[in-house]
Amino acid sequence: MKGTLSVLCLVLLVSVLEAAVTKPKFGDFIGCLRYRTSPENPITDAISFADNTTTFLSSYVSYTKNKRFSTPNYRKLLAIVAAKHVSHVQATVVCAKSNGIQLRIRSGGHDYEGLSYMSSVPFVILDMYNLRSITVDVSSKKAWIQAGATLGELYTNVNDVSQTLAFPAGVCATVGAGGHISGGGYGNLMRKYGITVDHVIDAQIIDVNGKLLNRATMGEDLFWAIRGGGGGSFGVILSWKINLVDVPKIVTVFKVNKTLEQGGTDVLYKWQLVASKFPESLFVRAMPQVANGTKRGERTITVVFYAQFLGRTDALMAIMNQNWPELGLKHEDCQEMSWLNSTLFWADYPAGTPTSILLDRPSSPGDFFKSKSDYVKKPIPKEGLEKLWKTMLKFNNNIVWMQFNPYGGVMDRIPATATAFPHRKGNLFKIQYFTTWFNANATMSSLSQMKELYEVAEPYVSSNPREAFFNYRDIDVGSNPSGETNVDEAKIYGSKYFLGNLKRLMDVKAKYDPDNFFKNEQSIPPVRVM
């Protein structure tokens, strides 16, 4: 391990020195940072350089969640600025822009393609994890949350003052609020309350000129864009003001497995017909996954059904028996618990795990993984499901699964143009494809197998365009080089992520960042659309 780290540090040092030679303004950038920050809030301690390789490597890896992008040949990283004060963010934006250095903004590091912490041109990471304050006002049912705070921290802070308030966001506790909220993050409350951006009522953002703006000073067009269009194309999100939502003191959850031998395909087919029509207080996720069979060395598909009901077991059983008896849900399958404890259930923590784990911030990279997404408008026929199972079983020794996340409820009633997030009425469910592997040598074969699974699903999902979820970043749906933005290419991936909202997003980008400073391989281009 020590040898690997030494080599990694050496390559980092070489790459940074090479970048510094090719970017003589890097020294001016550092000088600019010091000039633009005050002695009361010095920025020096927030900067990690390659000449301090232990700190530099630790800073990079701590918020690198996909191991595919933790190897040195992927990056030309000059420095990491882990901002500790708003002035650090402002200075980093102004100084990077004035010195021609690309900026990548990282909140929690969960960008699936690493675009928040990678580039093929010399760049600086602006890390937001130190800006993590959360203020909850119970009387108004509102909260301010900084971009570097995690969902686990938000849920815990809310629960500390009220056990009957929550926020409709995701189930991964370590996800950062900055990117998750701006991309339209969702969770098991979406059928009842919608998604994150539907509950944002104010925001603070640093614009391309280093100015601190809120909803009143940024204008409604920019405020619309950062709610679902991804904040990283328009500026640096500092914080969000959100409306909290009501939940009962006790919710009910269940987890039921159905193998193919137990009729898993038939049960899942019926799920497609009923999941989006359940009462909006009920969310049932279906998760087909590769599992060990009954015989040694045999692999099969098990469909796992996870559910949350905003009520008690008896009421849930009545709904299930009437609408979906095929699942065979039993009273003993159900567990009643607080909403906060239900977040542990959804994250697959063992029973009895203390809720304090929601505050943990793992400091090592995750596994190698690849994810993709789809939206489904009509039920996938059983023969289509069987083709998907056959393809999933081709994966080598990977962990591989799909998540079917139901729509319906309030999602059908919010207009596609209400925010920049467009995927609303007309969807039965959203699919997430996911595979994990544990050896870098398996990367190419794993990516190829994921591509095959995605191709097999094509006849059964949305088309023209084939829609995709922005927060499940997927470079395969289209991309630009790190230092360029081709509008035609941007329209390819942009139309999949944002559908008819892309034109308005491009107009907003042209107004607020006409020189395209805030860019990455899948950013919004600054083009006025007539």
From Swiss-Prot:
Residues 73-247 form the FAD-binding PCMH-type domain. Residues 1-19 form the signal peptide. It is found in: Secreted, Cell wall. Its cofactor is FAD. The keyword Disulfide bond applies. Disruption phenotype: No effect on the levels of ICN metabolites. Coiled coil: none annotated. InterPro entries: BBE (IPR012951), FAD-bd_PCMH (IPR016166), FAD-bd_PCMH-like_sf (IPR036318), FAD-bd_PCMH_sub1 (IPR016167), FAD-bd_PCMH_sub2 (IPR016169), Oxid_FAD_bind_N (IPR006094). It is an enzyme of class 1 (oxidoreductase). Binds 1 FAD per subunit in a bicovalent manner. Glycans are attached at residues 52, 257, 292, 341, 441. Gene3D superfamilies: 3.30.465.10, 3.40.462.20, Uridine Diphospho-n-acetylenolpyruvylglucosamine Reductase, domain 2 (3.30.43.10). There is a cross-link at residues 110-172 (6-(S-cysteinyl)-8alpha-(pros-histidyl)-FAD (His-Cys)). One of its GO terms (cellular component) is plant-type cell wall. SUPFAM superfamilies: FAD-binding/transporter-associated domain-like. One of its GO terms (molecular function) is FAD binding. The FAD cofactor is bound via a bicovalent 6-S-cysteinyl, 8alpha-N1-histidyl FAD linkage. Its EC number is 1.1.1.-, 1.-.-.-. Disulfide bonds join 32-95. PROSITE patterns: FAD_PCMH. Keywords: Cell wall, Disulfide bond, FAD, Flavoprotein, Glycoprotein, Nucleotide-binding, Oxidoreductase, Secreted, Signal. Belongs to the oxygen-dependent FAD-linked oxidoreductase family. Probable flavin-dependent oxidoreductase. This is Berberine bridge enzyme-like 4. It comes from Arabidopsis thaliana (Mouse-ear cress). The lineage of its organism: Eukaryota, Viridiplantae, Streptophyta, Embryophyta, Tracheophyta.
